[in-house]
């Protein structure tokens, strides 16, 4: 399945592919 977004991204970068730091500071599906 697809990777799950949801990590915190206080630095503005998400480590999970296909995820965006929006709304900050939580990664959500880009």
From Swiss-Prot:
Pfam families, A to Z: Cyclotide (PF03784)
Domain notes: The presence of a 'disulfide through disulfide knot' structurally defines this protein as a knottin.
Disulfide-bonded cysteines: 5-19, 9-21, 14-27
Any single GO BP term: defense response
Keyword Manganese in annotation: no
Keywords tagged on the record: Disulfide bond, Knottin, Plant defense
Protein name per Swiss-Prot or TrEMBL: Kalata-B13
Function: Probably participates in a plant defense mechanism.
PTM: This is a cyclic peptide.
Organism per entry: Oldenlandia affinis
Record-stated family: Belongs to the cyclotide family. Moebius subfamily.
Positions of crosslink type Cyclopeptide (Gly-Asp): 1-30
């Amino acid at each position: 399945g697809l990777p799950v977004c949801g990590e915190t991204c206080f630095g503005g970068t998400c480590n999970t592919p296909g995820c965006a730091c929006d709304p900050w500071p939580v990664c959500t599906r880009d």
